[in-house]
């Protein structure tokens, strides 16, 4: 995130075949929203998501912004996530901005507590913080990886070893289609 804002979002469609998925599955993935607002209360974004008729919505992080000067829309973003759950179940993992806000609690003036408390009350929102959920109808496991900030350094890259990943998430389920929500800010 370099502070540049896009006034438009882009819809990209991919088709995948995985024989472990029991029936057709439509996923909407929204990442790096960075508190951007598309129309009043993000109605343009929500309408576009609804038009796609997803079975689930995946949010692999950076929905909010941790910079103090740009946090004014955190509540709008949280409300957008709440409205997404009216379209389909939402699976959310943290990115570097959520992690940054969480780790800098003393500097946030209660911003993280307010945001996370609001999210906790949302029905059909599944927070995946180094955890996974099995979704029976499709035979899919959705994993959410929450990396420490050390993995987000831009100049000194810290490799993520497989044993570290396994210690954080456990072993992948070989009989299921496994989906990993992991944020990479580059």
Which residues make up each language-model segment?
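Glycine-centered flexibility motif
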Residues: 1, 87-89, 144
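Acidic, histidine-bearing metal-coordination/catalytic regions of metal-dependent phosphoesterases
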Residues: 1-28, 34-35
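Intrinsically disordered, low-complexity regions enriched in small/polar residues
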Residues: 3, 40, 93-94, 134, ...
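Short secondary-structure boundary/capping elements
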Residues: 8, 40-41, 160-163
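A generic secondary-structure signal marking the coil-to-beta-strand transition
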Residues: 12, 23-26, 90, 138-141, ...
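Short, composition-biased local secondary-structure segments
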Residues: 16, 80, 84-86, 92, ...
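Conserved catalytic scaffold of divalent metal-dependent phosphoesterases
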Residues: 20, 33-35, 98-186
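Membrane-embedded segments
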Residues: 22-126
């Amino acid at each position: 995130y370099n502070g540049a804002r896009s006034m438009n979002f882009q819809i990209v469609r991919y088709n995948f075949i995985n024989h472990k998925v029991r029936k057709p599955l439509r996923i909407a993935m929204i990442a790096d929203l960075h508190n951007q607002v598309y129309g009043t209360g993000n109605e343009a974004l929500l309408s576009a998501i609804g038009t796609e008729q997803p079975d689930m919505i995946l949010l692999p992080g950076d929905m909010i912004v941790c910079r103090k000067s740009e946090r004014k829309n955190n509540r709008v973003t949280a409300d957008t996530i709440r409205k997404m759950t009216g379209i389909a179940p939402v699976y959310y993992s943290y990115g570097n901005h959520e992690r940054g806000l969480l780790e800098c609690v003393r500097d946030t003036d209660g911003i993280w507590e307010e945001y996370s408390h609001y999210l906790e009350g949302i029905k059909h929102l599944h927070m995946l913080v180094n955890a996974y959920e099995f979704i029976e109808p499709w035979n899919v496991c959705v994993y959410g990886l929450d990396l420490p900030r050390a993995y987000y350094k831009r100049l000194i890259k810290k490799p993520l070893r497989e044993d570290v990943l396994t210690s954080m998430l456990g072993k992948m389920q070989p009989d299921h289609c496994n989906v990993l929500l992991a944020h990479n800010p580059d």
